[in-house]
Swiss-Prot record:
Amino-acid positions noted as binding GTP in the UniProt annotation, renumbered to this chain: 12-18, 40-42, 304, 330-332, 412-414
Function statement: Plays an important role in the de novo pathway of purine nucleotide biosynthesis. Catalyzes the first committed step in the biosynthesis of AMP from IMP.
Subcellular localization, as worded in the UniProt entry: Cytoplasm
Cofactor comment: Binds 1 Mg(2+) ion per subunit.
Main location: cytoplasm
GO biological process: 'de novo' AMP biosynthetic process; IMP metabolic process
Gene behind this protein: purA
Organism in which the protein naturally occurs: Bartonella quintana (strain Toulouse) (Rochalimaea quintana)
Residues that, per the record, bind Mg(2+): 13, 40
UniProt cofactor(s): Mg(2+)
EC number: 6.3.4.4
Pathway participation: Purine metabolism; AMP biosynthesis via de novo pathway; AMP from IMP: step 1/2
Listed name of the protein: Adenylosuccinate synthetase
Length: 429
């Protein structure tokens, strides 16, 4: 029996959706353990595109899917995404979808605050999706969040709302924004309560019971480890922990329950929003990668910044997340290039270093040190075995493995789930 954590090792958009969908056939349960609806991914199943940003990927396969306590849940978006999937023919009932009773809710006031802050910042733009994720996590840490279970306790809900508004209305007065009426917020929550509560459960107990009888659990991370609130490119990060260890605290399981950590990495690098990006290519190569890779955000539609593979960053996240194997995606995007560069180190103030410093100033000053490899003209798209790959593509993969201290367990050669080469099965006992 094995339980697997899937974590992005870059800045998100690594192709986790396809890999999670591919692995979900081997799993009994799929769990989202952090983030909100700010990070989207697309699944391609039988030619149909499913765009998800909050609901676990396992739903498309009819697997028991859990939204863990580490996720912040926008109840209105939950209802909308549920309807969208159902309209596409996906059958979703409380029997296959559960939400942790102690998951915090994202409210309209969180979205307002997020947008007001982002538009009002002078100089420092974080590049948030303005969906209220950060403010919702602030209220969780500040012990004033409205949680899923509170929707069922209407006799105490108003008191919790008033406590929350004591904080938020003070902020709004300071920003010159109209205050929120407690009854209006109560009514807003009651509009969706009946659609949320049937899915509520004590999910840590459900996971423990499943573990005791040998169920296979797949823990699905959102975003990427380089957006982690502690280990990412702070302050250009998200508001939750995105490293693999968050699978434990974000779902209510112990570290011993995790048997394999699978890191996801693109064969090049992308980033959405602001922040340092040492290997970014603001040139024809960047345009080529963006167009060939269709690099536009699922949630925001924003154009992604593109650059060469950064082995320094991926190796750093492999170490921090305890990654045992890598799923390498979008190798086919590199088809046809005469040469391909890999960042193997940095220069910082005249010195060679092999890690990304935590200091924002140092991160902005590092200069990539590249090694250039010969490209390949043959197609890797839709390859189903190593024998189908050009020799130079295999050489590129092997060099990445050496640089990041992790072997490739899966290789994705197109968005279609069937175009996946399995080297090591993460669920193997």
């Amino acid at each position: 029996m094995a339980n697997v954590v899937v974590v992005g090792t870059q800045w998100g958009d690594e192709g986790k959706g396809k890999i999670v969908d591919w692995l979900s056939e081997r799993a009994d349960i799929v769990v989202r353990y952090q983030g909100g609806h700010n990070a989207g991914h697309t699944l391609v199943v039988n030619g149909v595109n499913y765009k998800l940003s909050l609901l676990p990927s396992g739903l498309v396969r009819g697997k028991l899917s859990i939204i863990g306590n580490g996720v912040v849940v926008d109840p209105h978006h939950f209802v909308a995404e549920l309807k969208k999937l159902r309209d596409q023919g996906v059958k979703i009932t409380p029997e296959i979808l559960r939400i942790a009773e102690n998951a915090p809710l994202i409210l309209s006031l969180h979205r307002d605050l997020d947008a007001t802050r982002e538009s009002g910042l002078s100089g420092l733009k974080i590049g948030t999706t303005k969906r209220g994720i950060g403010p919702a996590y602030e209220d969780k840490v500040g012990r004033r969040a409205i949680r899923v279970m509170d929707l069922a306790e209407t006799n105490t809900l108003m008191a919790k709302i008033e406590r929350l508004l004591a904080h938020h209305n003070a902020l709004r007065r300071g920003m010159g924004v109209a205050e929120i009426n407690s009854q209006a917020l109560y009514d807003e929550l009651m509009q969706v309560a009946d659609e949320i509560l049937p899915f509520m459960d004590c999910t840590w107990r459900l996971l423990d019971e499943s573990y005791q009888v040998g169920k296979h659990v797949l823990f699905e991370g959102a975003q990427g480890a380089l957006l982690d609130n502690d280990f990412g490119t702070y302050p250009y990060v998200t508001s939750s922990n995105t490293v693999a260890g968050q699978a434990c605290t974000g779902s209510g399981i112990g570290p011993g329950v995790i048997h394999y950590v699978l890191g996801i990495a693109k064969a090049y690098t992308t980033r959405v929003g602001e922040g340092p990006f040492p290997t970014e290519q603001i040139n024809d190569i960047g345009e080529f990668l963006g167009m060939r890779g269709k690099e536009f955000g699922v949630v925001t539609g924003r154009k992604r910044r593109c650059g060469w593979f950064d082995a320094v960053l991926v190796r750093q996240m492999v170490t921090i997340c305890g990654v045992q194997g890598i799923a390498l995606t979008k190798l086919d995007v590199l088809d046809g290039l005469d040469e391909i560069k890999i960042c193997i180190g940095y220069e910082l103030d005249g010195k060679r270093i092999n890690y990304l410093p935590s200091s924002m100033g140092a991160q902005a000053r590092v200069m990539p040190v590249y090694e250039t490899l010969e490209g390949w003209k043959e197609a890797t798209a839709h390859a189903l075995s190593w024998e189908d790959l050009p020799p130079q593509a295999v050489k590129y993969i092997r060099y990445i493995e050496k640089l990041i201290n992790a072997r490739v367990a899966l290789l994705s050669t197109s968005p279609e789930r069937e175009d996946t080469i399995l080297v090591t099965d993460p669920f193997a006992d």
